[in-house]
Amino acid sequence: MGAPVGRREFLAGVGGLGAGLGLGALSHWFPLPPSDVKPAWSPGREKLVTSSCLLCPSHCGIRGRLVDGKLVRIQGNPLHPVNRGGLCPKGVAGIQLLYHPGRLTGPVERTGPPGTSRFRRVSWGDALDRITRALAELRSRGDARSAVWLAGETSGIMGEILRRFSGAYGTPHLLLEDYADGSAEVLKLCQGIHAPPAFDFSDSDMVLSFGAALSEAWWCLPQAARAREGQSDRRPRWVQIDVRHSRTAARADEWVPVRPGTYGAVALGIAYVLLREGLYDHERIGERVLGIEDWEDATGQVVPGLRRLVLRYGRTEDVSARAGVSAETLVRVAKTFGRASRPVAVWDQSVSWRSGGLADALAIHALNILVGAVDRAGGVLVQPPVPVPRLDGPADGAPAGGAVPSWI
């Protein structure tokens, strides 16, 4: 039987094992082209390039530091109005996207069966010729509707060009994945505007967060972090409604734990208190909002309004039992939210991306509508559309496949 192992020997052995594993990992070949090594140090030619980060809809301003024409660092742009010099870890790591060995720098053609990673590079001329021939063949057969266009970042005029092209070609299958978290769909259904919301934390006096990772993976971490700075009487009060004690919940002024999948129910319960106690913006609701009260459709059928639905399904006792939050806490948070001067309710993709999440996000945004936080300082803002020039219609009239409206 071996000698007994004490605490000191055990820790030393574990440390040696970790060092060995780390050195072993370094021995593996990493497919990155090595940088040119100079025989002697020299300062190099430095250049700063101003741009925007496109890794999330915030589009923070960035500065890239180039040395001898090679990007070596990405930093926030202190002159940009959105992030004011701050930058989240994802934005800083954008340099890894540039140098990643799997990054596509041109068109490729699949050489293996679907699901494999076997591709070969083709020239731009060859790729454009193939696409043109395939589109022309579909259109000549009257089968233009079978074409599908998938696109990612389409800010500015690019999205309008794709919409006009798909409509002129004759396919309704245009999918623009600009805001795949569903936030733009929430604003489209509530306000008729297909755009992501912008939450004005700096001018708000209460932020009611439904699972939003404001200190971890928010769209614009610098803006959220900046709003948290300063003395408690000069920054908004943060209430985090969350299923776990996340980093954001730990830094909030109050954490309200709830059961998973009940964000929408909690929002409904808060709306119940706002309507019952009259803690909503009567003036804005009366002037700018439709559907709060019952209304009649074109056939004369009475459609229940938001007030009737909330008072029927958002009773405090029912929401308390379902979400696992006490009725006293629910009422207190709702009254604090309704009595604030510039409150705002927020959510993120952890809410809207899951199954049934769109309904939850709609319920949360309904709180902003009730307290008049839409299109107001300290509330929910929407970036106005880019004033791009109006494009002319198709030169050859209606396509063979039949022009149909594009959808997003």
Residue ranges and their predicted role:
Residues 114-120, 279-325:
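N-terminal leader/propeptide and maturation segments of large enzyme subunits in energy/redox metabolism
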Residues 237-246, 333-343:
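Active-site-adjacent bridging/hinge elements
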